[in-house]
Amino acid sequence: MIALIQRVTRASVTVEDEVTGEIGPGLLVLLGVEKEDDEQKANRLCERVLGYRIFSDADGKMNLNVQQAGGSVLVVSQFTLAADTERGMRPSFSGGAAPDRAQALYEYFVERCRQQAIDTQTGRFAADMQVELVNDGPVTFWLQV
């Protein structure tokens, strides 16, 4: 399971002219689900994403996680993160989970975030989405479990 996380000052996702999720300061999480992923991996990745200390403390050091910083989380499904790009000029998506399994794990991940008392907004699974963000820093990390 893969999360591309970005520290943002704001972010939103729109589907068919409807804003489905919008946050102020916090994390934009682009989430990719791979074939071998399961709930255990989703738990580990959620723990890492929410615990990752990429927000500045009073001394300006990256030392706070999203909850300590008072931020929110916007989770957007992104199957292209599971692509194999090592060969050729066209990505292969054979490493991605089947759509029904990917959706179940995406929803599980979102629910785990919400259980941690963090404001968690979402896109719409498998929809054509427009994502807007202001990357703060920029600060972007690739987390994989």
UniProtKB/Swiss-Prot annotation:
Is RNA-binding one of the keywords UniProt gives this record? yes
The highest taxon in the source lineage is Bacteria
**Where is the motif Gly-cisPro motif, important for rejection of L-amino acids annotated in this sequence?**
137-138
> Which Enzyme Commission number(s) are listed?
3.1.1.96
Q: GO: which molecular function terms?
A: D-tyrosyl-tRNA(Tyr) deacylase activity; Gly-tRNA(Ala) deacylase activity; Ser(Gly)-tRNA(Ala) hydrolase activity; tRNA binding
For this protein, the parts annotated as crossing the membrane are none
Q: Name one Pfam family in it.
A: Tyr_Deacylase
According to its record, what is known about the domains?
A: A Gly-cisPro motif from one monomer fits into the active site of the other monomer to allow specific chiral rejection of L-amino acids.
Record-stated family: Belongs to the DTD family.
Name of the protein in question: D-aminoacyl-tRNA deacylase
Which organism does this record belong to? Salmonella enteritidis PT4 (strain P125109)
